[in-house]
Amino acid sequence: MAHKKAGGSTRNGRDSNPKYLGVKRYGGEFVKAGTIILRQRGTKTHPGVNVGCGKDHTLFALKDGTVKFHVGGALNRKFVSIDE
């Protein structure tokens, strides 16, 4: 028995919506409490001092201050903090 898909069908005809991930506020920028600093999948960058982490791993400011990106800790991880 011959196996052939119905004419006109395709497996590739779709595209996902953009997710707008990435850094929203850069190092040295002044931010207010609640400002989103970084949207990401997983914790590529970890929250430091005065930074919170949402359920989708979005990092946001807990206090007003200046954004600071740095590397540190025992595992040499990337962090973002807010300097008041």
Curated annotation (Swiss-Prot):
What is one term from the GO cellular component aspect held by the record?
cytosolic large ribosomal subunit
- Which InterPro entries does this UniProt record tie to the protein? Ribosomal_bL27, Ribosomal_bL27_CS
Q: Where is this region: Disordered?
A: 1-20
- Biological processes annotated in GO: translation
Q: Which family does it belong to?
A: Belongs to the bacterial ribosomal protein bL27 family.
PANTHER family documented for this protein: LARGE RIBOSOMAL SUBUNIT PROTEIN BL27M (PTHR15893:SF0), RIBOSOMAL PROTEIN L27 (PTHR15893)
NCBIfam families recorded for this chain?
L27
What name appears for this protein in its UniProt entry? Large ribosomal subunit protein bL27
